[in-house]
Swiss-Prot record:
The lineage of its organism: Bacteria, Pseudomonadati, Pseudomonadota, Alphaproteobacteria, Rhodobacterales. Keywords: Bacteriochlorophyll biosynthesis, Chlorophyll biosynthesis, Photosynthesis. One of its GO terms (biological process) is photosynthesis. The keyword Transcription regulation does not apply. Pathway: Porphyrin-containing compound metabolism; bacteriochlorophyll biosynthesis (light-independent). The gene is bchJ. InterPro entries: BchJ, NO_sig/Golgi_transp_ligand-bd, V4R. This is Bacteriochlorophyll synthase 23 kDa chain. It comes from Cereibacter sphaeroides (strain ATCC 17023 / DSM 158 / JCM 6121 / CCUG 31486 / LMG 2827 / NBRC 12203 / NCIMB 8253 / ATH 2.4.1.). Coiled coil: none annotated. Gene3D superfamilies: Trafficking protein particle complex subunit 3.
Amino acid sequence: MTAHDQRLTGGPAIAHRIGPNAILQLIPVLEAAFGPGAADRALAAAGVPRPGPESGMLPETQVSTLHRWLRDTHPEEAPRLLREAGLATGDYILANRIPPLAQRLIRALPAFLGARVLATAIAKHSWTFAGSGKFRVVSGRPLSFEIARNPVVAGESSDTPLCHWHAAVFERLFSRLVWPHVAVRETACCAKGAPACRFELLPKGR
């Protein structure tokens, strides 16, 4: 049942959620960039509660609000900081969410097969980073993903793609397990008016 269906039937609306690392990994990045207490000040200014280290899934609106606050308040630094947070999120996933045996198996496969296995796993767990958006693998060669109605940039308007955090997460996972020199390029973005944010993986880099 969709949120729209629930409104029609009088049921509660769905609170779509995203994994806490979309905020947790940004906290040390903000502290490193702007000094002690910077993360708490940012969260307070954005009106977002600070998640604890054992937080479960967070409302996607908290993630989008903090990311948008950073882009609005620090437009020059935001792409780099969100990228750093995305790389750290990828490191967390590798350390805590993908079993070592699975990682060894992916690395042992020919790259095109390893990429397919990893992409399938990402799609299976896309609810953790796409929230109310819809993730799908668009093509295999070149490997491309998209997140339709990406909630992390909901309501944004920009001349350039904004999904530095998502792109960096994908980059870290594929660089560690499949293509060491991979680059991830966002070729379409909801913030630019596209129906989906699309990411193209370049195995040999840019």
